[in-house]
């Protein structure tokens, strides 16, 4: 099975991690979260262990910091809930071990995937010709079939940089007509509820931060509990973001995930109004330079390219961009998306 491209919809933002000055506990917590969302728990713990819980003013942050320490410092995995099917629980336990070892750097990613595949291969009936060591792309359809027979829905594939496993029990279908900068996009959205696993990102940060949805060539998927369905966040950071993926899958087949995310985040900036400055702050805080982490890379590119267009040589930053009006920022994002489309359109025509 070709791994499914998953899009993060970030439910919180973490502050930038680079700081030459000593950080207080809130800043240390945010730095830990920023690194954890990139799958680098080893570096995250260097900040998390300096957090003084009593200095955190947010009860939720204290709870999350305690949970992360239990999982990744004390190595105490949370118990599988008693109402979970035992076989599904074994699959989840295998993924949790893989996520933990890979994020902590105690096992290389490739070795972790091989060990995960070997564990899962013992839990399914392999087809003829699968070979003695089938990979995860072979195993995932078999796992999905077995989970569905037990009343679950599942997502596998890759949420860079790790293999993914999300598991939920309820799903209903909705239809939306999404207004994008380059045209309207009618799409189907599967609303998901009653989650058992919110994926590696949710596991890393104790569900303080997790995937809120994704797109496939057929339809969109939304974690219902992540959104107020009447809010701008849902309409912009989910529907518009993921709707752009849907359009780009069709228009630019094979477009790399970092570029898909860049285009979708430009659409967010083009449509956001009340949430626009918060989006700029989030993109600025969470940005990174490596295309190996597509969302942070796209965050940085959006801030960088908006700054080049509007600031005329000044240092890129959300603070500087917020000197411009909502309308100016919306228009600049539309222009950047159009420029990106023009660069890609001839290539798409030739394929």
Q: What residues fall within each predicted segment?
A:
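Positively charged n-region of N-terminal signal peptides that target proteins for export
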Residues: 1-4
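Bacterial N-terminal signal peptides
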Residues: 6-16
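N-terminal low-structure segments adjacent to metalloprotease catalytic domains
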Residues: 19-153
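Post-HExxH zinc-binding segment in Zn-dependent metallohydrolases
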Residues: 96-99, 256-291
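Active-site scaffold of zinc-dependent metalloenzymes
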Residues: 161-231
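Post-HEXXH active-site segment of zinc metalloproteases
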Residues: 218, 232-233, 249-266
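Active-site recognition of the HExxH zinc-binding catalytic motif
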Residues: 236-250
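Long, well-structured alpha-helical subdomains associated
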Residues: 273-351
